[in-house]
Amino acid sequence: MNNTRKKTLAIVLRRTDFGEADRIINLLTPGGKVSAMARGVRKPKSKLAGGIEFFALNEVVLIEGKSEMRTLSSARMREFFGEILKDFERTEFAYQAIKTVSWLCEQIESDDFFEILLTVFRSLNNFEIDLSLTKKWFNLKIAEFSGDEINLESDKNGKPLQADLTYNFDFYDKVFVEDSEGDFNANHIKFLRLMLSSQPQIISK
């Protein structure tokens, strides 16, 4: 059977040295998580090295054979989010997001993880977007896909959330509880809905 070449966008999740000059690269693509062997990538003049950097959107060509391990045929960087590296907290959270998404890809099959991680990188790269906003957005999106999402439609008793009422939040059941002296009102709920339906770049404006 002939090997198949496939061009795709990819984000590097992990790089592991293999042998004297190779690396095994874990990539997140729009179609999911894949592993590829980058042969000779650690050699000084390797043409692959520039296309497998962390915090970047890369365009790669993968050769698919009989095994699950692909071979990286070519790689070039499309977009580099280098501003992230200028701030320790943003860098730390970017690595945390990579680790979280990589783990979830093993548990849940979804094409959305690629766009989620790419959005996180673009948001962290823009210092006009507050770091806390990006963190909240990411955590809400991850909770949505891991079955731990917040109920933003009805309260604990199944009644639709009302604009003229206040609520407290049940962290165990991830649901709002009606309370006349509650800490959460319609504005808080509206903001959470906006977070789930939009992106940090838009919310921050």
Predicted segments with their positions:
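Non-catalytic alpha-helical scaffolds and adjoining flexible linkers that form interface surfaces
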Residues: 1-24, 28-205
